[in-house]
Swiss-Prot record:
Keyword vocabulary terms for this entry: ATP-binding, Cytoplasm, Kinase, Nucleotide-binding, Pyrimidine biosynthesis, Transferase
Pathway in which this enzyme or protein is active: Pyrimidine metabolism; CTP biosynthesis via de novo pathway; UDP from UMP (UMPK route): step 1/1
Protein known as: Uridylate kinase
Assigned protein family: Belongs to the UMP kinase family.
Species annotation: Bordetella avium (strain 197N)
Length: 238
């Protein structure tokens, strides 16, 4: 078993990360690669909970949602996360991982509701828990759901998987002199106006002294290196 720096973590996966190079939907090779990395971390003995977004599915129907009531659109997005959670659960099952999906919206015939004591028991038993439907409320992002669930389950860190390998002093695609921060405090990130998460999620993590690690999900082995405490991505700390 490889060494680990954390016992319990909350992994935030965006729905867009599941698209791979596709315009929307779930790219099969991408989800297989992700589950390989998740399986590696589970094999290290890390208790792993996952919050997943729904942008890859909602993007496909977004043009039809123009002018729609915001709350209605948000509920559609929540249901998209349930579809992603089921797809991820199925892929993890094929890796031999015992996985549970818990939803903030009640769809009892498909997934079980989020019940914190059950979540904690599942994690202690070595099961991977996937949280779906965000917070269950409109106007809150899945980043906020990640911060909330991370605090609720006593995660030691929120791992935010993105398309870039950390937080930079400027947009690295536009500024060749941009440098990656290895570590930065919550207060520094605010002063420098660096976008780590949405404001609500960021404030919740800061208030609960819950550190955030931003790293690239597209970088092979990055998740394992992050959990192992290596210099990967950017750590946002109190």
């Amino acid at each position: 078993m490889s060494s680990r720096s954390y016992k319990r973590v909350l992994l935030k996966l965006s729905g867009e990360a599941l698209m791979g190079d596709d315009a929307f939907g779930i790219n099969r090779s991408t989800i297989v690669r992700m589950t390989d990395e998740i399986a590696e971390v589970a094999a290290m003995g890390v208790e792993l909970a996952i919050v997943i977004g729904g942008g890859n599915i909602f993007r496909g129907v977004a043009p039809g949602a123009q002018g729609m009531d915001r709350a209605t659109a948000d509920y559609m997005g929540m249901m998209a996360t349930i579809m992603n959670a089921l797809a991820l659960q199925d892929a993890l099952k094929h890796k031999g991982l015992d996985t549970r999906v818990q939803s903030a919206l009640n769809i009892d015939q498909v997934v079980e509701p989020y019940i914190r004591p059950k979540t904690l028991r599942y994690l202690e038993e070595g099961k991977v828990v996937i949280f779906a439907a965000g917070t269950g409320n409109p106007f809150f992002t899945t980043d906020t759901a990640a911060a909330l669930r991370g605090a609720e389950i006593g995660a030691e860190i929120v791992l935010k998987a993105t398309k870039v390998d950390g937080i930079y002093s400027a947009d690295p695609n536009k500024d060749p002199t941009a440098t990656r921060y290895a570590r930065i405090s919550f207060d520094e990130a605010i002063v420098r106006r660096l976008e780590v998460m949405d404001a609500t999620a960021f404030a919740l993590c800061r208030d609960q002294k819950l550190p955030i690690k931003v790293f690239s999900i597209n970088k092979s082995g990055a998740l394992k290196r992050v959990v192992g405490g290596e210099d990967e991505g950017t750590l946002v700390h109190v």
